[in-house]
């Protein structure tokens, strides 16, 4: 009888620990997707978490955020709004949730809205405050060689990883932008301090924290012209620094990204926008590599559009 009581107690403790680990896994995988989708430095890339050959989640993200500034460039105060949409896929093979080598796939579509205010005391220096909200709708697919049972742990796995969930991240930030010309080269220094809060579905604990992003960029002079429009290149270094509370969810304390963007001005070639605010539209080719202090690394490469005046 005593042996039976002890066995039942062990099973009860085991199920509680399993439920906690399932919550942590959901918080970690979805939290990574939320952070990357929200990050101006890291979104639209492919990233790996963990060592080769081990439990190694992989995330692919693709999105676009478009800001709109009211007023004119020389105005002292300029409010702005932004809107964006994106898609991400988080995959983890041979998950350690169960001992059966199961696979997790979380496919998400997200929407982002926000706005803020810039203060421009000089032509090359600005302060900014703003905020945004990103809502992510996630469709989970849990693949297992051993069917899920009616146990509490397995049913929680089904609820979180084999169903649809809605999660979100809220971002309040303030920072500055400085655009000096150094030895004839246009440069840019930028930094923002963020307060982030992640909200998770199904009663999973929220996570909040502070993080700092920085960027240093230098622009070349005109390299050549195509159809009489300038082509130039930018080289940059970006950094993301996260407090420990947030780092445990997103998988790193500090990350550094190095990249280049090739721009070709096309706005004047398009009749319907050549005399509008979109006249500075460029086709942009970007390549970036990211490393971190933990087992987080990634890259991104793609063709898009930019609104940068040459």
Give the residues covered by each predicted segment.
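Subset of outer-membrane beta-barrel
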Residues: 55-57, 66-75, 105-107, 118, ...
């Amino acid at each position: 009888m005593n042996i039976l009581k002890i066995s039942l107690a062990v099973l009860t403790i085991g199920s509680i620990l399993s439920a906690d680990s399932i919550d942590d896994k959901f918080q970690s995988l979805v939290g990574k997707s939320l952070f990357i989708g929200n990050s101006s430095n890291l979104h639209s890339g492919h990233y790996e978490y963990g060592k080769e050959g081990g439990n190694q989640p992989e995330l692919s993200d693709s999105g676009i955020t478009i800001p709109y500034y009211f007023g004119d460039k020389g105005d002292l105060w300029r409010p702005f709004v932004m809107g964006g949409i994106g898609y991400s896929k988080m995959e983890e093979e041979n998950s350690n949730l169960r001992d059966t080598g199961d696979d997790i796939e979380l496919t998400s579509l997200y929407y982002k809205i926000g706005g803020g205010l810039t203060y421009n005391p000089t032509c090359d220096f600005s302060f900014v405050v703003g905020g945004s909200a990103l809502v992510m709708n996630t469709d989970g697919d849990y693949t297992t060689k051993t069917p899920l049972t009616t146990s509490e742990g397995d049913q929680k796995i089904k609820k979180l990883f084999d169903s649809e969930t809605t999660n979100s991240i809220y971002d309040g930030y303030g920072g500055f932008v400085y655009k000096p010309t150094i030895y004839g080269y246009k440069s840019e220094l930028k930094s923002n301090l963020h307060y982030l809060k992640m909200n998770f579905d199904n009663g999973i604990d929220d996570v909040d924290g502070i993080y700092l992003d920085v960027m240093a960029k230098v622009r070349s002079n005109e390299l050549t012209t195509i159809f009489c429009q300038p082509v130039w290149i930018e080289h940059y270094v970006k950094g993301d620094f996260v407090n420990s509370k947030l780092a445990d969810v997103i998988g790193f304390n500090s990350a550094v990204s190095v990249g280049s963007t090739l721009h070709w001005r096309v706005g004047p070639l398009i009749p319907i926008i050549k005399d509008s605010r979109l006249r500075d539209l460029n086709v942009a080719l970007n390549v970036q590599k990211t490393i971190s202090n933990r087992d987080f690394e990634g890259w991104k490469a793609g063709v898009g559009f930019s609104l940068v005046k040459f």
